[in-house]
Amino acid sequence: LTNTWLIYALGGGWGHLNRALALGRIAAKDRKVTIITNSPYALKINHENCIVNYISEQAGFSTTCQQVREIILSTQCDRLIIDTFPRGLGGELADILPQLQAIPRILIHRDINPDYVTAKNLRSFVAQNYDTVIVPGEGQDLPLADLPNVQHTAPWLIRNCEELPDRMSVRSHIFKVNPDIKTILVCAAGNASELSFFAQLTLRLQQNFPQCAVRILAANCPADIPEALWISHHPGIECLAAADIVVGGAGYNTVYECAAVGVPLVAFAFQRLYDRQAKRANQVYRVQNIQQAITTVSTLLDRIEVTRNLSMPSYINGAVQALHYISA
């Protein structure tokens, strides 16, 4: 056995890459883990002992598909793990998966638009081409969650609770904030095109809550944001855990990381081609515009005790559960 796991994690934003790293870093203790990604964020962060095959997001559609196929067909692996898109983001896996019957093929079933599932006849494709389907904490109400080979785990997180740094040290060293000041963190994950919206949101929050510290967590510093407000830190969960309130989108990482560390999330549900942020946003404080966000933050601030930040969060990391299912 080569004892190599190959993880397909193509797709925008942080979610696909972060899930791959959450699983890959614990799997890599006992085997080689290779991740295929086209997330530009992959160039900025620690690869957690995984080998990252980066395909430029500037590469055209056919080039990307070709590169993916070449990597998969030339990698000797004993697990092939596909995140979210059963046929690949561009359908590039549709004809190669049936050739790989000898390798256990695992689908990570993040929520996905049911119209896409129907249009591409994914139900029968998954039934024929995947040995196991793992739902990473997204609940029962998913298009493929009733297939017979489905396993459910808690959400996948890139840090176990005992690995998180002390909240107060994050506040002082990373946020550069006094421990007794309430902190509002804007989490600018998602698409680069949304960065200017998050910047505007950050400035409005700062105007409205001068008694609080407001920070923006983003891979790149937005144009109109003073450098003192900007935080670039990966993994983001270490920062979310140290905030009093998080304001962001309703993507996979933001929602489940905030839930795990017990910090309230005020969230905008952004439109995505395949993801249903609106469905996930039902679990958090959903808002439609900046004014609603300000009102909601104001209400939450009245309820929050700063002392909460002294306790360490406790949660189950679904990536650890998934490791057992996949290696079985």
Across the structure, where does each feature detected by a protein language model lie?
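Nucleotide-activated sugar donor-binding and catalytic core shared by glycosyltransferases
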Residues: L1-V214, C221-A328
